């Protein structure tokens, strides 16, 4: 995938399945398409598994001497089941703790980033009567909205200053899954 740091950083290595196709469109011009599915977090109940699905198309043009390259791509990424889901029932207690799925959409503090809007996932009973058995002493947080970013990338590479090369790139990302009503 051609992607920007706005979607995920270079050091992220995704495990999963991906495929790529390329087509020669004209001398020095080719098109490409990429698609993949990557598990992000798996649970015993597969209906709660978190996945990243991605698809991208683009073109790459190189001048006849190879001094200039222009590359453009647009991608759609769907982070499935990543958004927080508020619990409706009281938390499990006694022998059900750790067996009954609860708070599986929690967004751990260790991976939170600036700019992520959060919602309280605790069951309403835990908010109104915090002494209810099984209720945590503090709030449990999840991501407030869905993530379905569209990523548009354009790059120009100049190689006529060999042995140096100058890269100029621009990326625009919009989260098409964001809905203010979710917050």
Per-region residue spans from a language model:
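Detector for outer-membrane/organellar transmembrane beta-barrel domains
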Residues: 67-183
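Outer membrane beta-barrel
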Residues: 1-83
């Amino acid at each position: 995938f051609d992607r920007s740091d706005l979607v995920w950083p270079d050091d992220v290595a995704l495990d999963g399945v991906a495929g790529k196709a390329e087509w020669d469109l004209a001398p020095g011009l080719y098109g490409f398409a990429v698609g993949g599915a990557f598990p992000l977090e798996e649970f015993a109940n597969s209906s709660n598994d978190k996945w990243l699905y991605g698809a991208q198309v683009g073109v790459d043009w190189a001048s006849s001497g190879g001094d200039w390259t222009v590359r453009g791509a647009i991608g759609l990424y769907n982070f499935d089941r990543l958004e927080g889901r508020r619990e409706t029932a009281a938390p499990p207690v006694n022998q059900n703790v750790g067996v009954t799925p609860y708070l599986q959409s929690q967004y751990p503090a260790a991976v939170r980033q600036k700019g992520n809007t959060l919602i309280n996932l605790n069951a309403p009973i835990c908010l109104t009567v915090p002494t209810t058995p099984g209720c945590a002493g503090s709030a449990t947080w999840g991501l407030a909205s869905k993530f379905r970013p569209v990523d548009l990338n354009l790059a120009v590479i100049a190689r006529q200053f060999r042995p140096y090369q100058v890269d100029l790139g621009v990326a625009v990302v919009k989260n098409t899954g964001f809905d203010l009503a979710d917050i």
